[in-house]
């Protein structure tokens, strides 16, 4: 299917952006309040007089007294200058002076008080401000005024300086301002500067000052999805120059700051040549787990999921989840393959499923109840309705389906899982009965060989891998409607064993492993369950409004996306739910153009430079 | 093209094995010699009497004297036993006793001599053997007899024991025998045992004794191509258990023994999970270069070539060089792609070039003067005659050609090179003139982008990468027949510079980088030249009998294979030459079914389990 696209802008297969925004983010506006004024009580006899303007008059009066050095009862000595002012005014305007004058301190009685920590000019500015509400903040004095205002607790002046600084932010001064905010724990200013640095990271990372950034700030900035980098290598090099700036002091901090560098997203060659060979990295054994995670990700792809495998917003790649084939209303079969990008809220159709573009609809292959999985960013699909042997893999870079070696045993309602960088095809239905056969694929030799068979023959079960073990959950066994058994395979012993059973017997279910739990959904369960391999225990995560038999579930953008399925009345469902494990919240993400069930759903990393012209007839027989 | 094959046995596209064996290995048989006897001199008067049997009679006589203790002039005291014998007999049979009795040593005069280092029973056996030529070697006494015979220099007895041991070799005793041979520096026995261990490695590596193997022997055994392992992982695990057996002593030897483990051939996942994570490996910084080589090989394939990237004989994979397309006699174009395996002396045709199987010959694409290179074991081909833009890649595991993104600038007589895990397309001819444009391919984004252009516009040049730099050699520049310029690109500076010029101006040439030199052949040079990037100097390697314009050259099995080309009379050549850098020898390897020139020639690692049924129509549009 020919897709045309402008350079740099993602266009949808068909316009959906509107529908995506629709029901989800209603903006609320607070009614704005006008400043108070003369308010009459209705019954006419009494008047609540609220003279908003009086405070200004009062203040002018105080200023005039100060100008005439009248009734002044304290002299603030700063450097060589002396400022006479009124204790009561200072106490009213500043908690610092309030504490000084109202508590039983010696200053309470002294006529002349020596003030440290501020220069005369800044004192002059602050006193003028106190008595006139006016002050001239300039690039030259803002830092001194802010520090003094913070010291004497002139909080409104502190905010004024902070917003002055926020406006004046530029690549050269932002780090300095950040340190200022840090030392005086001005949290809102700090947040503003941090998001400025995040947005303008590329211009800032080369500045000298950046190298003096405190470690926590650096750690926080590097964690952000919105960090404006097009290549993760820029992030790695920033961290390394930051450490190299003060090696003795900062080598021990390397694991902490490296934690937020998304090493798996680095170009594999760059990773080997620059990261692996970096002398500091080689001297620091604690970073080993981070290196191993990246090494395994380069070999296996999504089998390794962590906050470091999610592309950042401005990198030319995006984590997307796919809806592959399946069937829709009135049992029509779906040949389309759709990529959904929750971060950019876009939907894109890619190359149709193989053997689905014959003139005669009846000749088209029905990709239903097949199995699918991602290995090294390629989507493998196998088998399908009526005991198929076919195996194809989809390469999203070249947007093509490519056939690989047939399965030894044709099957459907089975599952595929990636474990230790190898694809496993597990169980399913061979047209006669449920089978326990398991096959693994060797990509170099392009051949399937048998692995240890299941303990219980099942079909329409859920399956996924988690920390070097493979889990097969529930499904329909021979001679029974459904089972609650959890079967677990350990490749190091090549043995299957039973783990804690599910809370319910269920089939037509799907599972994904995310962070340290396995999530299961579908069947007649009307709920999302989670299994903890560590504790070998199950728990209910959340109820669902409807049954979702044969729905899809895929981890993407640090959330779980549940797609389609069949409700209690066996109707196809078109909505996509989103479960946010951190916020523990279930939301309806969007509505698909049409309902779908018995489809495949996986996650891949998709290139986002632009859609180049892709010409049919692109692969030889 | 459907290829059928039995399980486990490679069958040729067409029977060729005969022709390969033909002209190359004539076996010679030495005439056998009969033992000497009575020889008459022709003229009848004198007879040269050579009584071969006399020595036996003499020996029996001496034995009888010994039995009767007659004329015995020395008593050898061994433990509590005494052996009286004749000095002259002992001296004649053993250099040890000759030295003892003939030199001015005290033993020369002593009647009774105490003999150390041998037990009575063994002495008895040796003396019987000396006087009767007979001895009974058994499993129980062979070690003691051999040690004594070696001590007393009964060399024929030593050999007899050695061959007894060689016959009796089994997985349990071979290591012991090897140590025996080692300590007594019995080189021939040592060699025999080493080759026994190499042939039966899998059974032996688990034996306890294996862990006591001396380091040099282990190092030697692991180096062998014939080491009987089907998976390189078996070699790695052997080395690690050998080191772990005496860690304190052997950790420092790890880099030395690991040197002969072919880490690049390990399954990439096994490499990350087991090798990278091994505690001893992580404690040993000196192995870093070996790890880096494997990491880069997993990313880039043949850009990294060393003794460790060549599969061993019994592993289910083989290094093969390919002959791709080109043209043959009377300008007919070749659509076939052939793999030649020098180790197994086999030739196999694989999937034909893309777009070459139309009914109408004229519609077929003419794959001539295109460029080709291997990246991550996939063969990339681009452009070709009449300014083509096509780019395809061949995956040998699934035996398919797959189209990828077009070149920005169509070209032919250009070259492709892999550098830093990236494919570069360089210069060439765009139908009008030679160009200096260089493009690089990003596999993830499937797009070509421009890189720094050549200094000199050239076509039909030679090009290769060597230790992180790219070299463009000779070729036809605009306005001149040929050039001798060597252009060098350094990606770290993104700059081209000129290096030492070739000894001759030449075009229609090809180059490969092998170990620390770049070899160039072809054009009208009638010779193979080599360039040393280290010394930036050229030298003549060897003359060739004919010109070989537009021939192919590929490194395989630690040798260089030069294929086809055009001779002085512009006739296509069918022979394949082999240059062995170690032996500095040029040999004619084999003759192809037909001559070929302007073809592509690269090296890949090919799976050797078996040819499974590969069905046409295997890739979706």
Curated annotation (Swiss-Prot), chains A, B:
Transmembrane segments: none annotated. GO terms for molecular function: ubiquitin-like ligase-substrate adaptor activity. Residues 72-139 form the BTB domain. InterPro entries: BACK, BTB-kelch_protein, BTB/POZ_dom, BTB_POZ_KLHL6, Kelch-typ_b-propeller, Kelch_1, SKP1/BTB/POZ_sf. Keywords: Kelch repeat, Repeat. Involved in B-lymphocyte antigen receptor signaling and germinal center formation. One of its GO terms (cellular component) is cytoplasm. This is Kelch-like protein 6. It comes from Homo sapiens. PANTHER family: KELCH PROTEIN, KELCH-LIKE PROTEIN 6. Coiled coil: none annotated. One of its GO terms (biological process) is germinal center formation. Residues 174-276 form the BACK domain. It holds the Pfam family BACK. Found in germinal center B-cells. It comes from the Eukaryota. Gene3D superfamilies: 1.25.40.420, Kelch-type beta propeller (2.120.10.80), Potassium Channel Kv1.1, Chain A (3.30.710.10). The gene is KLHL6. Kelch repeats lie at residues 320-367, 378-421, 422-468, 470-516, 517-558, 560-606.
């Amino acid at each position: 299917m020919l897709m045309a696209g402008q350079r740099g802008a993602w266009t949808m297969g068909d316009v959906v952006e509107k529908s995506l925004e629709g029901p989800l983010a209603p903006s609320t506006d607070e009614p704005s309040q006008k400043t108070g004024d003369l308010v009459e009580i209705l019954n006419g006899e009494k008047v609540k007089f609220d003279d908003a303007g009086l405070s200004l008059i009062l203040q002018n009066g105080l200023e005039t007294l100060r100008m005439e050095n009248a009734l002044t009862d304290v002299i603030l000595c700063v450097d060589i200058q002396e400022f006479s002012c009124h204790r009561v005014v200072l106490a009213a305007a500043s908690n610092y002076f309030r504490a000084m004058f109202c508590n039983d301190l010696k200053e309470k009685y002294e006529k002349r008080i020596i003030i440290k920590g501020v220069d005369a000019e800044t004192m002059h500015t602050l006193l003028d401000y106190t008595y006139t509400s006016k002050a001239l903040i300039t690039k030259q004095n803002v830092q001194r005024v802010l520090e003094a205002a913070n010291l004497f607790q002139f909080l409104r002046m502190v905010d004024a300086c902070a917003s002055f600084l926020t406006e004046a932010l530029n690549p050269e001064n932002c780090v300095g301002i950040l340190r200022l905010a840090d030392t005086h724990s001005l949290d809102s200013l700090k947040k503003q500067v941090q998001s400025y640095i995040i947005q303008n990271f590329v211009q800032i990372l080369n500045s000298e000052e950046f190298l003096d950034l405190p470690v926590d700030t650096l750690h926080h900035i590097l964690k952000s999805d919105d960090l404006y980098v097009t290549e993760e290598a820029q992030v790695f090099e920033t961290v390394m120059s930051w450490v190299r700036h003060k090696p003795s002091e900062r080598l021990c901090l390397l694991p902490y700051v490296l934690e937020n560098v998304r090493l798996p997203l680095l170009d594999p060659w760059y990773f080997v040549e620059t990261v692996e060979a970096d002398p500091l990295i080689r001297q620091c054994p604690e970073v080993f787990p981070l290196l191993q995670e990246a090494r395994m990700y380069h070999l296996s792809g999504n089998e390794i999921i962590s906050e470091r495998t999610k592309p950042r917003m401005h990198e030319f790649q995006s984590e997307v989840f796919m809806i592959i084939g399946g069937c829709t209303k009135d049992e029509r079969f779906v040949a389309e393959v759709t990529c959904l990008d929750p971060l950019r809220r876009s939907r894109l159709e890619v190359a149709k499923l193989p053997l689905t573009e014959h003139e005669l609809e009846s000749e088209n292959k029905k990709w239903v109840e097949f199995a699918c999985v991602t290995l090294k960013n390629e989507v493998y699909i196998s088998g399908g309705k009526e005991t198929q042997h076919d195996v194809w893999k989809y390469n999203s870079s070249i947007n093509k389906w490519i056939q690989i070696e047939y399965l030894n045993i044709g099957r459907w309602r089975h599952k595929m899982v990636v474990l230790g960088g190898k694809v496993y095809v597990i169980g399913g239905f061979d047209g006669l009965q449920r089978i326990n056969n398991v096959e693994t694929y060797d990509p170099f030799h392009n051949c399937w060989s048998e692995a240890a068979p299941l303990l219980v023959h099942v079909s329409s079960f859920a399956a996924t891998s988690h920390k070097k073990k493979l889990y097969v959950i529930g499904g329909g066994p021979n001679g029974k409607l459904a089972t609650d058994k959890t079967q677990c395979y350990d490749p190091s012993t090549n043995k299957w064993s039973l783990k804690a059973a599910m809370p319910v017997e269920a089939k037509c279910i799907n599972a994904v492993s995310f962070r340290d739990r396995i999530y299961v959904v579908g069947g007649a369960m009307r709920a999302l369950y989670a299994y903890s391999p560590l504790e070998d225990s199950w728990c209910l995560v959340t109820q669902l409004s409807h049954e979702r038999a044969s729905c899809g579930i895929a981890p993407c953008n640090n959330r779980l996306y549940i797609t389609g399925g069949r409700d209690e009345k066996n109707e196809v469902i078109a909505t996509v739910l989103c479960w946010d494990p951190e916020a523990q919240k279930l939301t309806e993400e969007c509505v698909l153009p049409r309902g779908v069930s018995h489809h495949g759903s996986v996650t891949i990393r998709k290139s986002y430079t632009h859609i180049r012209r892709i010409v049919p007839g692109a692969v030889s027989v």
